[in-house]
């Protein structure tokens, strides 16, 4: 044991501060405090080898217990997913679509939607109409058609450029935007037919008159 009484108060306080002990009091109190601390530390270090072996032997047992617990926990966790997979298989059976009229009806609707022609925008219709009219105008100028027809085509081009295509017009029918209507016979056609009928009637009357005249002469 060190001779603390030969040390100064400053040295004793330094030792006490290093050991985290109180530095208050007289020199004798400081010396007694250091001696007591040495005895306590010596008593802790004097542990029998048998006690150390017992402590070391008990530690692996304590360590082995958590290992066995981890193994059992892993087994329980691995068994849980099997239970959760069963409802998924049941859901697969439930989600299978049933074959029937509804399935065929939806397929027919999809096929009809895919085959339907896309609707043209007004600008696309205008471009298509101008292309057709310009071709007609070029053809009319090339083959020397009447100036009235050429002027009519030019007016149609100007009208389409300003107002677009009228869906009720003949031009819309030529472009295939609307179905062709069964137009009734115009008044001129009726007049021509009536004229033909009248001409046929006159020819019959004249033939009858000629026949009668020839009979009188005989």
Curated annotation (Swiss-Prot):
Compositionally biased spans, kind Basic and acidic residues: 72-96
Transmembrane segments: none
UniProt-recorded name of the protein: Protein THO1
Key words of the record: Phosphoprotein
Comp. bias intervals (Basic residues): 204-218
Miscellaneous section: Present with 6580 molecules/cell in log phase SD medium.
Modified residues (Phosphoserine): 22, 58, 68
Biased composition (Polar residues): 47-57
Native organism taxonomy: Eukaryota, Fungi, Dikarya, Ascomycota, Saccharomycotina
PROSITE patterns in alphabetical order: SAP
Low complexity compositional bias, start-end: 102-122, 186-203
Disordered: region residues: 37-123, 177-218
Function: Facilitates RNA binding of SUB2 and likely plays a role in mRNA export. Suppressor of the transcriptional defect of HPR1 by overexpression.
GO cellular component: nucleus
Entry superkingdom: Eukaryota
SMART domains according to UniProt: SAP
GO molecular function per UniProt: chromatin binding; double-stranded DNA binding; RNA binding
GO biological process: poly(A)+ mRNA export from nucleus; protein-RNA complex assembly; transcription elongation by RNA polymerase II
